[in-house]
Amino acid sequence: PIFHNFVLADEINRAPPKVQSALLESMQEKQVSIHGETFQLEKPFLVLATQNPIENEGTYKLPEAQIDRFALKILIDYPTKDQEIEIIEKNTSNLQIKVNPIVELKQILEMQKFNEKIYADTIILKYVASLIDATRNPKKYELDLENIIEYGASPRASIWLIKAAKANAMINGRGYVIPEDVKQVIHEVLRHRLILTFEAEAEEVNSDKVIDIILEKIPSP
């Protein structure tokens, strides 16, 4: 099932560590090794993984280094009332659900290439570098987070924050990144990359709150 352009790993934390490792390695290397033979994965190769935040029985914790390979972590809340009604209708009737393609593989590759051409000024790069550095060295920025953050964001976070900001600029019809693009995607990029302390958990401080504090402190260009 890994040899597809789009792979859905449903409840990835229920997969044994060996399976998790194999999937995440394929995400990083864009290839799979079977019995000593290496197979290249076709482009684009996109992985969407889900986790159940409530049920922990029978699950396996993903190592932080492997979680870091995911570009974004998006939180999905309960559906709205209208969405709930639509879900009920589609699942309690003889209605045939048909899914129509909305984009071709070629278009995805073209968008990925176009995204690389979006301009990010040095000022934006420095802003992103400061935001990430603040997660590692909060004291340098007069942030009282040393007892809250155990491990800050990795260099991969900086890369994906710029990539996501470029994508946000593209979606909004701009060929250049502005600080607002960074702010609009930073929670999705960083929330799974910040490792917090037990003290943070005791004080009910989550990654999103830490990101908010850093955004308020670091001056926006």
Annotate each PLM feature.
Residues 11-19, 27-105, 109-118, 166-168:
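Canonical AAA+ ATPase core
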